[in-house]
C-alpha cells in the first residue's frame, strides 16, 4: 500500500505535487530581461515542451518584462516580480509579470496593435499583440499609480507543429 495513502495523506500529497511555483524579483535593468526569459524556460522544462513552445513562452515573457521596464518605470529603476506556476497534471504554464510603476490608464487602448506611450523611443506598440499571439490566455490588470500585472497562460503539448 502507498506510504502516503496509509497515513491518510494520499489525496493531499497528490494535490500538493500537482503544482510547482517559482517567484523571482529583479531590478528593471535591460540585462535582467534575458535572465527572466531563461529562468522561465528552465522552469518550464519540467513539462517537456517543444523548442517552439519554449521560444513562444520566452518571447511573451520578454515582451511583458520589457513593457514593465519601458512603460511601467519609464526607464527608471524599479522592481519587477515574475511568478511562474506549473500545473503538472494539466500541463499548463502560467506566468505573472508585475511592476509597481506608473500603471496603464486605458488597458483596452494599450492593447491595440501599434499603440505606444513612447513613440519617441521608436517603440512598435506590438508587445501585447505578441503576448496574445504566443500564449493561450492574456489578462492585463492595471491602475494608474499602482502598476501593472500581466498574467499569461499556455497549455503545453497541444499546439500543432508549424
Language-model features and meaning:
Residues 1-16:
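Single conserved hydrophobic/aromatic residue that forms the stacking wall/gate
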Residues 37-62:
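Conserved short strand/loop->alpha-helix "switch" segment adjacent to the catalytic nucleotide/phosphoryl-transfer site
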Residues 14-23, 68-162:
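Conserved beta-strand-loop-beta-strand hairpin that lines the nucleotide-binding pocket
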Residues 23-35:
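STAS-typified acidic loop motif
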Residues 6, 28, 62, 116-117, ...:
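Short linear Ser/Thr-Pro motifs
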Residues 63-67:
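Conserved polar catalytic motif of the HATPase_c/GHKL fold
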Amino acid at each position: 500500500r502507498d506510504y502516503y495513502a496509509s497515513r491518510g495523506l494520499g489525496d493531499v500529497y497528490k494535490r500538493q505535487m500537482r503544482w510547482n511555483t517559482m517567484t523571482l524579483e529583479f531590478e528593471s535593468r535591460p540585462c535582467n530581461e534575458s535572465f527572466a526569459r531563461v529562468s522561465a524556460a528552465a522552469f518550464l522544462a519540467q513539462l517537456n515542451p517543444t523548442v517552439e513552445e519554449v521560444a513562444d513562452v520566452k518571447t511573451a515573457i520578454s515582451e511583458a518584462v520589457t513593457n514593465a521596464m519601458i512603460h511601467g518605470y519609464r526607464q527608471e529603476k524599479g522592481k519587477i516580480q515574475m511568478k511562474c506556476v506549473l500545473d503538472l497534471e494539466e500541463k499548463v504554464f502560467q506566468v505573472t509579470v508585475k511592476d509597481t510603476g506608473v500603471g496603464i490608464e486605458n488597458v483596452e487602448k494599450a492593447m491595440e496593435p501599434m499603440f505606444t506611450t513612447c513613440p519617441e523611443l521608436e517603440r512598435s506598440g506590438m508587445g501585447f499583440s505578441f503576448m496574445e499571439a504566443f500564449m493561450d490566455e492574456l489578462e492585463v490588470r492595471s491602475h494608474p499609480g499602482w502598476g501593472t500585472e500581466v498574467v499569461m497562460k499556455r497549455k503545453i503539448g497541444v499546439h500543432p507543429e508549424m
